[in-house]
Amino acid sequence: SAASDVYKRQDLSYYDRNYTKQELFLNNYTYTNATLNNLWANLYTGIDRANSFLEYIQGSPIDETLIAQYMGEVRFLRAYYFFTLSSLWGDVPLRLKSTRDTDMEALQMPSTPAAEVFDFIVTEMEDVVGQVRTADQLNGPGRISKSTVQGILARVYLKMGGFPLYKGKEAFEKAAYWARKVRNSRLHTLNPDYKEVFTNLS
């Protein structure tokens, strides 16, 4: 199931004998599972913060070039959070305005079909590719680079090619297109040693 993918095939799910994680591993979870509830809440917290940022940044005295870059990074993060949500839960509320705890109408917003959520995701990510900097222009990890957006776009299209959207060949071709963008940038290399996958910074 989608939810069990969070901890699927991981010995770490048993390491600390965390019952809520064991429920996922054993496909024996319910709507009360704390791990899933926390993940859902944290992703929507990130989305709400992104919405607030986008609503208020325009009035900032920050340099316009930096504003454009920051907006691109935040729009990407918001789209990525929706990608994570829809990959795990399918239809989810596509909340694009900041909310308050007392705004019951916004808090009870109905789910949006997964197809529409994914359309929003790719539209946003493709739109911000030109707003963010390349990896060699950033001072170390921790920021959203052009190849970050391109690499995640490849993953999004791979997901769209299979369940539940089944876009097939067209989606897979777009996944290959964005993956080639990362490769052809020549800003990234594969780790020569498998263990370095777990020790090196991405």
What name fits each language-model region?
Residues 2-7:
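Short, small-residue-biased leader/transition segments that mark boundaries at the very start
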Residues 1, 184, 188-202:
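Extended ligand-binding clefts on enzyme/binding-domain cores
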Residues 75, 150-156:
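TPR/Sel1-like alpha-solenoid repeat signature
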Residues 86-87, 93, 159-168:
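Short coil/turn linking the two alpha-helices of tandem helical-hairpin repeats
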Residues 15-89, 106-119, 125-141:
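Conserved, well-structured interaction surfaces
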